[in-house]
Amino acid sequence: MAPPGSSTVFLLALTIIASTWALTPTHYLTKHDVERLKASLDRPFTNLESAFYSIVGLSSLGAQVPDAKKACTYIRSNLDPSNVDSLFYAAQASQALSGCEISISNETKDLLLAAVSEDSSVTQIYHAVAALSGFGLPLASQEALSALTARLSKEETVLATVQALQTASHLSQQADLRSIVEEIEDLVARLDELGGVYLQFEEGLETTALFVAATYKLMDHVGTEPSIKEDQVIQLMNAIFSKKNFESLSEAFSVASAAAVLSHNRYHVPVVVVPEGSASDTHEQAILRLQVTNVLSQPLTQATVKLEHAKSVASRATVLQKTSFTPVGDVFELNFMNVKFSSGYYDFLVEVEGDNRYIANTVELRVKISTEVGITNVDLSTVDKDQSIAPKTTRVTYPAKAKGTFIADSHQNFALFFQLVDVNTGAELTPHQTFVRLHNQKTGQEVVFVAEPDNKNVYKFELDTSERKIEFDSASGTYTLYLIIGDATLKNPILWNVADVVIKFPEEEAPSTVLSQNLFTPKQEIQHLFREPEKRPPTVVSNTFTALILSPLLLLFALWIRIGANVSNFTFAPSTIIFHLGHAAMLGLMYVYWTQLNMFQTLKYLAILGSVTFLAGNRMLAQQAVKRTAH
């Protein structure tokens, strides 16, 4: 147990107040990442280009290839003096190796000078200028600048502009490089922002990293601060270092180059503040340890780290302010044992000073102060409902279990009282989770209640069987009472078997089955009862109604026989025959509709029959009219 006045510190997270402070780095190169990046660069040479990426990339990280002499021999043996690209790779790689000198003939020099022309591509101009610079050969910087500017107006890609920045860093400071420097602002405007955290070109990570490396190298060369905001630098940094595994040697080289300039330049050095250890590390002293590094995880030992203030997250009250961290080796420590923090969460605002180049040097740390909870004044009582008998109270001390059993029935209630205190400070605690669990020893049924504190922070749980019978499903029996205490700031969450309580419900309210029955047994099969069809009428009734319906037709035939049918005007003209056949067909269609067809099918056929019958009938009536007129 910690001595009084001390607490356990857990560092939970590194956050930022976005509305007040600048962005904080979310991605950087840890020591493990740096070693992995070095391993990505330390590959066997396959050609002069791969040798350049490997040698110069490792050099930017402060490392060397394993065998510098062998590497120099490889460069000399693979150099093609008639190829500008080959000369560029050889010049830059040999410059990164100590004692590796390469002699250049006049013909090769003339080749490089001839390549510095507006007829060459920006890439060729960059490689020629960098090769001349690497070999220590003279160059007319203003003429090279004119050729570069003229060619850049024809190549407006992001990569071409970045290579123009790289070229300018090899030219004389006496040349007017303003036109190239102004391209930086244009490139920044072409960056894409992702979620307010990342900033990169759509061309990808490699181009973004080369842009950062070229910008700071050129700005260090001309002595002017780059036109990039501090927040944008952090966003670029987050984008570049978000990737830890590299598919190509050139990609690893670009990240190494960007990391090198962000760690060492004259204007912007991002600060990375990292808690030492993980959230599971505990210390029986109130000490906060921070690692303050650059993007390569190299300690900024010359920095000064100060705590501006520490505020409680719950009350926003300031509990500590204006305190300096003490450098201990490569870390900075803040000992606040003399300050009595109550358990909970606190926001520590930390500032890193000591160099005006530092950016992202104000961060807010979320710190959790943990403690141990103690249970005091635990009383178990049975209270008579009509208060005719004085309450019976038994005091229990954690972690012991109360002796005997307690009864709760229709005549008396059961009550539990207790208080929670901070073991270290003695202050009262109100954890987030305070539960009373009752477990039926026979059926396994469990019922959980929340214990609430009163205005004096005394927790009370009272069991009235008449009010709680629904929760228990009126299941009488012996229940084990557990007290559960939990909170994110507690080192010792508690599950305490407090006592056995006999709960009795009236027998008439007892259920036929208890809740503990197996809820997953197969249920009784449901028998579906469909509606029975209506009974049909007797055959005699059906036949009677059929005869009644046909009676008018029988009457028609009877009258025709008695009076006589007038068929004198009937002709056997085609229109007459078609009309009567069509009429008969429509009557037949009605029968088929009744027995087989639906309405839409019937309408389709009726339209055809009706049209033919209509035309035939019209023709027939016209002929009858002509015949009458003639007579």
UniProtKB/Swiss-Prot annotation:
Membrane topology, as annotated: Multi-pass membrane protein
Tissue-wise expression: Expressed in all tissues tested.
Leader peptide range in chain numbering: 1-22
InterPro entries: Ribophorin_II_2nd, Ribophorin_II_3rd, Ribophorin_II_C, Ribophorin_II_N, Swp1
UniProt cross-link Glycyl lysine isopeptide (Lys-Gly) (interchain with G-Cter in ubiquitin), position: 154
Predominant cellular place of this UniProt entry's protein: endoplasmic reticulum
Function in brief: Subunit of the oligosaccharyl transferase (OST) complex that catalyzes the initial transfer of a defined glycan (Glc(3)Man(9)GlcNAc(2) in eukaryotes) from the lipid carrier dolichol-pyrophosphate to an asparagine residue within an Asn-X-Ser/Thr consensus motif in nascent polypeptide chains, the first step in protein N-glycosylation. N-glycosylation occurs cotranslationally and the complex associates with the Sec61 complex at the channel-forming translocon complex that mediates protein translocation across the endoplasmic reticulum (ER). All subunits are required for a maximal enzyme activity.
Name under which the protein is recorded: Dolichyl-diphosphooligosaccharide--protein glycosyltransferase subunit 2
Classification lineage: Eukaryota, Metazoa, Chordata, Craniata, Vertebrata
